[in-house]
Amino acid sequence: MGMRPGRKLDMVKRSFTILWARLPSIGAYLIVLGFIGIPAAAQEQASIMGRTDGGTYYLAAGSPYDRTVVRVRSPHEPGTIVIDTERRFLYLLQQDGTAIRYGVGVGRPGFEWAGIHRITSKAEWPDWHPPAEMRKRQPYLPVMMPGGPNNPLGARALYLGSTLYRIHGTSEPYTIGRAVSSGCIRMRNEDVEDLYSRVDIGTKVVVF
């Protein structure tokens, strides 16, 4: 005999009741209180991300790194981007105590970092200029690669402070959830396009 859909959703929500992380050196933390979903069986399986016209949030089905909405508690103001590099999630804090959560790829061992920056510029289908130290490690890289579907920066880029780091798309979506980059935060193209449309230059970004 199968489990009732509503009970299944309750179990999923309880499984993710309290997840939290903090970075004492900058006082950053974010507590995930749970997914926001609805019990109807058909909608329970729907891969619908975000808010519907009726104001209801849906639980995203599929990959654990699919875009979804979660309840959160954070000292940071709405509109802040908070990135949990250990769990490979990026959160965009909302006004109503929720956050849009996206899966990300992060820096590989030796290329991890943490801090607080602001978005200083934005670009659609950005060109890629691999820094000299990267080309020294990987001599086959070009000096410049024009923007496009094969460009490692993907569909959008959000540049962080005066650093070389960006939040950007990717031509390798299978790397989301992994630590493979040189320090940049990578997202699926459809996710970085969504995030790009929601944030402005000056947005605070907390990485821990």
PLM regions: where:
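Sec/Tat signal peptide C-region and signal peptidase I cleavage site
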Residues: 38-43
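N-terminal secretory signal peptides that target proteins for export/translocation
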Residues: 1-21
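Bacterial N-terminal signal peptides
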Residues: 22-37
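Short beta-strand-centered segments at strand-helix junctions
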Residues: 182-196
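Gly/Pro-biased beta-strand-loop elements
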Residues: 44-47, 55-170, 194
